[in-house]
Amino acid sequence: MRTLIQNGTVVTAQQYGAADILIKDEVILQVGENLSHQGVDQVIDAAGLLVMPGGVDVHTHLALPMFDTVSSDDHYTGHKAAAFGGTTTVMDFIPHDDHDLMPNIERWHRKAKGLAAVDYSFHMNISQFDESVLQQLEVLVEQGIPSAKMFTAYNRRMRLHDGEIFQVMRRCAEFGILPMLHAENGDVIEVLVQEAISAGHFEPVWHARTRPAWGAAEAVFRGIAIAVQAGSPLYVVHMNTAGGVDQLANAKSKGIPIFGETCPPYLFFTEEDLARPDGAKWVCSPPMRSEEDQKRIWESLEEGIMDTVGTDHCPFFFDGTTPIEYEGEWIAIPGKELGKDDFRKIPNGLPGVGDRMPVLWTTAVNTGRISPQRFVALMSTNPAKLFGMYPQKGAIQVGSDADIVLWYPEKTLNYGV
């Protein structure tokens, strides 16, 4: 099957200009101007449209168990949302429930089997530690899993201590595995949560007030320092503080291989949204920050400091007691109402995989804050490079997968919620 996309404007991380694209069997065969129709089975006229590599969202949580419920998107519904918004590759996180890594990997493959609507891959959480876990990290390479995520928060649940993180990073460096870090100060959070509860503060806004921005900034610096000592690169997930951005910029200025990701909610919402009557909708970790932090995150996108925009897509029903109709079936999954009397019990997470690209195009490209090429870099090319998918993903060039988005730059979309 040969398909020709003609008359479009091709946008990549480096280029912007007119070109046709010839595809054979889902792979790009040729890129150039005025390509021949000879032997072509299908012609797509992209006049007036932008032609971009499909989005790569490297931060999603699908069918994730949490607080006696599960996130409301599985691989089928989550992938459909991704495709609707122009994302053609997603990466999900495998929880480290069983001590040995392989049973967890096999379980997540079973969860996704037969449900995928786009290409997908996995990261591995490392939330238990001993010598055997270190030895098993080689399994990730064998299974094609390019990355391992660790946490400096969630004491007694997922957190690793600094020496353990150091050892995992050092082992990752041996195998070319990219360490990822959820950077908050778990000890400070634990103290502040107990103080809030003792004072009778159970409202959603206290989720944010007990997870301070400077604790996150400190943990970013600590993660960078540990990575340098371990001789390892580091990818810091869902960055949302001014102090964290400053640490990222400083490390990059010294040539340290540190990479940063932010997420759309941190560009548009603040801690004050959690003080609303429906504030549970905005509960995620790390939480929404101040307008000052938000301003610095925007600057990091504009100045080339931030490397990617993921979503941390992890949606929950706001009221799981009220069913909704989806594809002819009525569905109700316990959600944010589980924490209506205690912020500690609110399932953490927001949606985003379907609207990441349209929202950022509208607010960042159409407003002139970033260029179309920078948009493609953030949404597709950079994540593909960092997680071993480039140039199969994140590129429009001969030999790349034909994961191509035809983009209507002025189109208006209405999202139902």
Residue positions per predicted region:
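Histidine-rich, glycine-flanked metal-binding segment
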Residues: 1-53
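Divalent metal-coordination and catalytic microenvironments
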Residues: 8, 26, 48, 59, ...
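Metal-associated gating/positioning segment near the N- to mid-region
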Residues: 46-115, 132
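Short acidic/polar active-site loop segments enriched in Thr and Asp
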Residues: 87-89, 118, 146, 307
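Short catalytic-loop micro-motif centered on adjacent basic/acidic residues
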Residues: 90-92, 121-124, 233-238
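Alpha-helix-loop-beta-strand connector modules within alpha/beta enzyme cores
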Residues: 102-118, 166-181
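Histidine/acidic residue-rich metal-binding segments in metalloenzymes
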Residues: 132-309, 314-317, 325-330
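His/Asp/Glu-enriched, well-ordered alpha-helical/loop segment
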Residues: 202-231, 282, 315-411
